[in-house]
Regions:
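Alpha/beta enzyme core
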Residues: 2-160
Length: 160
């Protein structure tokens, strides 16, 4: 069952209109000043969601300056717990770009494993998962279908 209905009304509306604007500060951007500056720009620019690195203190500092819903991104499911407690609205397995720069790629099986671990830890929190662009197109489609079966609420793709 989808948890989309747990997201703020505005986010739900924009998702259904296929026009959600999510600004990403970066999976590994833990610089509070940088993320706060991005958050301010996102709010001024009309963003619907701010996607930040998964760190509770970062969530708290960003929520001090914006009312935008916060999505936290990580590839270690255990990290999500404290960020959700700190106020993150939803969670995402994704923003893999910082790993690609290091030559690290995520397989479909790795993404599925991370998804299952995350759903086990936080079954009542909306979950977004990014399908890696490094997979062949047919493998991306297969993974997306498997993610739906796993109960993922939002599936994202990467553009390269």
């Amino acid at each position: 069952m989808s948890l989309i209905n747990q997201l703020p009304q505005k986010v739900q509306k924009e998702l259904y209109k296929n026009s959600l604007l999510k600004i990403i500060s970066g999976l590994n951007n833990f610089d509070i000043e940088s993320v706060q500056m991005i958050a301010k720009a996102a709010a001024i620019g009309g963003a619907d969601v701010l996607d930040i690195a998964c760190k509770p203190s970062l969530v708290e500092k960003v929520l001090d300056i914006t009312s935008l819903p916060i999505c936290v991104s990580a590839v270690e499911p255990i990290l999500f717990i404290d960020s959700v407690k700190a106020g993150a609205t939803f969670i995402e397995i994704g923003n893999f770009d910082s790993f690609y720069e290091k030559g690290i790629k995520f397989s479909a099986n790795q993404v599925l494993s991370l998804t299952k671990q995350t759903k086990d830890l936080l079954p009542h929190i909306p979950l977004s998962v990014t399908v890696p662009h490094t997979l062949s197109l047919d493998k991306q489609v297969d993974l997306a279908l498997q993610l739906i079966k796993e109960g993922v609420d939002i599936i994202q793709t990467e553009g390269w």
